[in-house]
Every structure is written in C-alpha cells, then in structure tokens.
Amino acid sequence: MHLHKARSLLLWYGLVKPMIVKRAAAAQTTMKKTTDNSISRRLFITGSLAFTAMPALAQDGDIFSEQMIWRDPSIPVAGNVKGDLTIVEYSDFNCPYCRKVFPVMQKVVREDGNIRLVYKLWPIFGPASVYSAQLVLATRGQGKYVQAYDALMSSTSRVTEAGADKTLAAAGIDVSRAKQDLQKNKSEIETILKRHHAQADGFSFQGTPSFIIGKFRLFGAHDEEVFKQAIADARKMLKGG
C-alpha cells in the first residue's frame, strides 16, 4: 500500500470536526448511572480522543479516562511495558479479521520495540467467545494473560469452549486452575468485559478488530504500512507536532 493511501485511511478514521459522542452515555449506563458531567459530554477532536482536553471528566471511575483506556490496571500489557506509545486493541477470538491482523500487529510491535500493547477482549461472536474471553482473563492469576491470548488468537479455526480448554492446556496453562479462578472472580471478570463493551460502543466501533493508537482510532485489519503510519502520526500528536 502506498503512503498516500495510508494517509487517506488516517484521515478517514480521524473525525473532521468536534462532535459529542452521544452513544457513550448510553454505553455508560450499562455500568452506572451518569450525571451531567458524564461521558455524554466527552468530545472527539480532529481524529484524536480528547482525554487531555477535558480534565474535569477524566476522573477516577470514569471508564473513558486516559487511565482506564490506556492503563487499565486489570489488563496486563504485551510489548514494552515502558513504551512511549500505547496501542489498545478490542478483539474477539472468533473474529477472522482479528486472527488475520494478529501476526501483523505482533511484527509491528516487535520491530518498533517501544510500544505498550493492550489486548481488550470484546466477545461479540457468541457464547464460545464469551467463555474464551472469561477464561483468558482468569489466567491472570497465573501471570499468563498474554500467553493465553496469543494461543487462542493463533487458532486457525473457530474457537469452541472445549477447543479453548485444549488450546490453553497445550500452551502450558493450568486450565483447571483458570476455571476455578473464573468462578472465584466471575463478578470482576464480567465487569471488565462490560467495561470493554461500553468503551467500544462509546468510541462507535462497529466490530472487531478496532484499535486506539495513541489518541487515534483505527478500524479493521490493515497491513504493516498503515499501522506504522498510524503509529508515527500518533507519536507526532503526543509530542505536540
């Protein structure tokens, strides 16, 4: 893909004028009641997410705060944990385009070497996807969230509940313990998935995979060139360029 095409894509996913994201208010009601100073007044500006433009809204407990989008403490980080740029990916293990883009994103992050990659599970492809997402979140107790994610996203066929168990076991994960941890932490895990869904809905994502790259949004599976251009532009914006 030529650079001018990549830049056109970046212009496409960047919004041209400020707008109020009304859907975010509806999404937030699935988590808690909102007030006049809630997500309903969050703005997007010229392709960027207005995290810093509206500090009064970026408070603890706000699922659209910079902290909860980029640095949610409940989600382990892949890539460079001290990287200067964060990429957040909303994905589903049964999304064919998520599986297609998985090795591309891994290569881009590995070659860059300075990116924090945050996998946020957004299971929208049915009960098997929900089960798989819950089970992977339950592997955090073993310190194997990223390993579990990588194993299931490397699947070449639809992930079933039995298939998820088998794949994770083959990847060296204690599935019995993960299931026990899932039952023990079911409420917290369900809250995390609801939060991811509310965030994705608030950002007007139409499906998986969807990305937040710095303060840009990007939809769908793309090639290396598009991701690298998005990363370069995101770094430029964060540096005030």
Model-flagged regions — what are they?
Residues 86-171, 203-206, 237:
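Structural alpha/beta surface segment adjacent to cysteine/selenocysteine redox centers
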Residues 39, 170-241:
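C-terminal cap of thioredoxin/glutaredoxin-like
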Residues 26, 56-60:
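Boundary at the C-terminal end of the N-terminal hydrophobic targeting segment
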